[in-house]
């Protein structure tokens, strides 16, 4: 496993840092992404903006795929994802996105993710990703 590519990704992911997101690779293709809902994420006095939740779920889908292909010196980009919101994400709560790759070809990967607040399902999604050589992304 080329752990340096994951470290490089963490260091270069300025958007994830801005939103306060952090992830852990549990195994190739399986990750958890975490974010505490803060004031900067809110659309109402109590609930996160859907875009903040969409960013977390897209990141989790993508990093699950990245963790599957980075040992091949590849990175991924989102082709598409479909998402459902189930409950609001409330201020101060820790959200955990659990994502895994369900299909992996040479170039196309599909992943699924669910965001939880404790045991409450907040959102779910599936996405399709393109894998390509890391040099094309500047790594």
Specify the residue positions occupied by each region the protein language model found.
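Terminal targeting signals and extreme-terminal segments of soluble enzymes
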Residues: 1-139
């Amino acid at each position: 496993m080329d752990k340096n590519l994951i470290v490089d990704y963490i260091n270069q992911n300025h958007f994830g840092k801005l939103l306060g997101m952090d992830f852990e690779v549990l195994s190739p293709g399986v990750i958890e992404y975490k974010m505490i809902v803060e004031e900067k994420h809110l659309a109402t006095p109590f609930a996160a903006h859907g875009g903040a939740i969409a960013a977390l779920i897209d990141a989790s889908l993508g990093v699950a795929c990245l963790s599957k292909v980075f040992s091949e010196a590849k990175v991924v980009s989102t082709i598409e994802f479909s998402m459902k919101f189930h409950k609001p994400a409330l201020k101060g709560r820790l959200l955990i996105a659990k994502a895994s790759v369900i299909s992996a070809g040479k170039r196309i990967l599909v992943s699924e993710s669910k965001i939880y607040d404790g045991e409450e399902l907040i959102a779910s999604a599936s996405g399709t990703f393109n894998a390509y050589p890391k040099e094309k992304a500047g790594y």
